[in-house]
Amino acid sequence: MFKLTTKFHVFVFLFLGIFAFSQEKKQFPNVSGLLQRIIPNMKIDSWLLIHKSYGKDNVLKQVGRVKDYTSPSSGFNIGIAEEDEFYYIVYSAGGKTEYVTNPEELKKFIGKADDVQEAAVLAAADGYIIDEEFKDMAGNYSEDKSNYYLDLGKLTSKECPYQKKHYTLTVNKVSGIITEVKDNGAYIELYNKKCTNNPRLLKIEKKEEPKDDPKKKPSRSRR
């Protein structure tokens, strides 16, 4: 009986340990590191992943040799980027040089998500972001036997307020499809001085509203 009880306790302990491990949240690498892990879902001869910042190209990953390509003037981003900063992919297939410069082309290049990193990149191509400054909120994931659970952000308003919300996306491991999206609310909400809808200013204005003086009762004249 003692041996049976001991075995049962060990089984429960191991089960809970495996469950806790599967639910443990892990942070994604930075955006450039995440993009370097993607694998093309098409037959290509060679390809380059390039980060372009202020007109300067920086090759982040090279598979084979791509000849005779021109640096484009625009590309894609999957995080919060500077104004003159983007990524692009150049690949060679069937003797032709092709480019990936927008989210739709990026999704086609990756195809179905083969792992959690590709799932995050595909979600970002649909408008979500990996927020490198707030990975605890919008740049981490957990998983179980059936699904990935991605905590990602989204820029929902650029001014009055500047707002970012974070979401939990459930991605099926087999299909690579997002099956559920949970809105966890705003984690960044900033108002500048020009915002007339700033809640704090509205509260101050409400407090400063002058109260109407009570009407003075007419004094009775003495006879």
Give the residues covered by each predicted segment.
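Extracellular/mature segments of secreted proteins
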Residues: L202-K206
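A short, surface-exposed beta-strand/turn
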Residues: Y162-V181
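Short, solvent-exposed aromatic-acidic interface loops
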Residues: V181-C195
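Acidic, glycine-rich flexible loop segments
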Residues: E118-Y167
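Long, low-complexity, intrinsically disordered segments
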Residues: K211-R223
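Bacterial Sec-dependent N-terminal signal peptides
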Residues: M1-K25
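A structural detector for beta-sheet-dominated domains
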Residues: A81, V90-A93, V100-T101, S142-D144, ...
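Extended, low-hydrophobicity segments enriched in charged/polar residues
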Residues: K25-E132
